[in-house]
Amino acid sequence: MLVRLTKLSCPAYHWFHALKIKKCLPLCAPRCSSTSAVPQITTHYTVHPREKDKRWEGVNMERFAEEADVVIVGAGPAGLSAAIRLKQLAAEQGKDIRVCLVEKAAQIGAHTLSGACLDPAAFKELFPDWKEKGAPLNTPVTEDRFAILTEKHRIPVPILPGLPMNNHGNYIVRLGHLVSWMGEQAEALGVEVYPGYAAAEVLYHEDGSVKGIATNDVGIQKDGAPKTTFERGLELHAKVTVFAEGCHGHLAKQLYKKFDLRASCDAQTYGIGLKELWIIDEKKWKPGRVDHTVGWPLDRHTYGGSFLYHLNEGEPLVAVGFVVGLDYQNPYLSPFREFQRWKHHPSIQPTLEGGKRIAYGARALNEGGLQSIPKLTFPGGLLIGCSPGFMNVPKIKGTHTAMKSGSLAAESIFKQLTSENLQSKTTGLHVTEYEDNLKQSWVWKELHAVRNIRPSCHGILGVYGGMIYTGIFYWILRGMEPWTLKHKGSDSDQLKPAKDCTPIEYPKPDGQISFDLLSSVALSGTNHEHDQPAHLTLKDDSIPVNRNLSIYDGPEQRFCPAGVYEFVPLEQGDGFRLQINAQNCVHCKTCDIKDPSQNINWVVPEGGGGPAYNGM
């Protein structure tokens, strides 16, 4: 069930429409504070321990435990590649290895969202017989176009051979369908795949090495009390635990701190990707065409761009999407509404006119590149795929590097597991060879070559400076320049105070090309058990109003692409309170990344909840 939004949820709504000006005025005191007590928002046990709650006295908290050789968290391209490669090696060498894979989505692929234009290199390495097996690679790229948009015009830019955005030899895919197919291959090889099980906790041995994971408890009321149906989560123990949670994984966040994995790298920087699927007029359908743009409606200092892919899926289907770098500065910016505005560009709207939108979704993505990759291994576990972040940003691709990292991890794990001279200083195996092998692979070479392109957009010319840098230095030196540019810090630190920014007045959606937020989220299939604690937890319930609303005019109500956060009037007294509509959450992780106070902590809801994407 989706939660309907109200115009009162945005204090600035009345402000904009009463004044009808584009100048930021001093913020009004009533929305900054109230004499009444701060309403309790967070009831989750990660913030309010159950040991201190009398309602939990006498509840059986024992957990059942299972043992495996390898446990993998996340059934995306990386996690499935690791599982499949492990079982391939085991079959080749006659070894018996138990591999368990847990996935929080109700079905494999239901939480997967990407463009996606696939570089098939790693996929073909993993499945040399992919054609015979019927892999859903149905749309080879036949036409590749890139352009700069102004408000009214499209300026074509040639894609020269060797530039990272060249898509010759690639395939347009529905990544959710490809992941679902990979899940079938994994199960056929003997991988134990458990959809609907959300990994909620990292378990440790007494020596500090990773022991495995525990899935989350189910049967807890919204107020934090146990239901009569309460069930403790399951523990999965393994010699090696592989974390393939995707971008900004909530367990990876804990591991970064536990093992200081980010001590020698830049802060990760992110983007938010929004996507829709459309069925269009068959006369406008060009199967295999790839379109990318930069520029309007974003200004030059806001990194981002768009894609429009024509799929050959038996019907005139196109994937349209928009990416906004989460290092943007204006708190009034709404990535969702920028996306809706972009579709009205004279070069985009004609393709969609007369068509029907059939799906919507959003997901954060890593943009930090080589400089932001953390240490990948630690006693008992390792990180693969988009969890550490192997996306090639100028290439606009990360699936191929994620898959290769999974395969390399599997090969390193298998070698250590089956070694006759296995020695380990810790109970959980430390597979250090994985990071060494990755740095010697084409993944590292590819990311090293493009390492300076994304941070080159931070200069006075913004995105256009990055394009100039690419055209000169990358074209000539191919990434061999003897310097490495730095990112400018975490995305949460980049917002300016609202008083220093110009409000953005977005056009009203027309219901044909552009749409409102609620009708969009409805197309994601998102659903959560209503009577459970909100999985969007706050470290301090007072901060959203006292700091975020006061200083930044409540940016969470705009950066969330699903209408999860609303500022609504207090029932008693003056001022506002934050309302969290957790049922709407599409698990994109943007709030955890962009919150300027770093007060929001995304944790897993009950397994099986969230979006139900069909081939996104």
From Swiss-Prot:
Major place of residence: mitochondrion
UniProt PTM: Acetylation of Lys-95 and Lys-222 is observed in liver mitochondria from fasted mice but not from fed mice.
Intramembrane region list: 108-129, 427-446
N6-acetyllysine, modified sites: 95, 131, 222, 356, 415
Cofactor note (record): Binds 1 [4Fe-4S] cluster.
Residues covered by the 4Fe-4S ferredoxin-type domain: 576-605
Pfam families noted in UniProt: ETFQO_UQ-bd, Fer4_ETF_QO, Thi4
Record's protein name: Electron transfer flavoprotein-ubiquinone oxidoreductase, mitochondrial
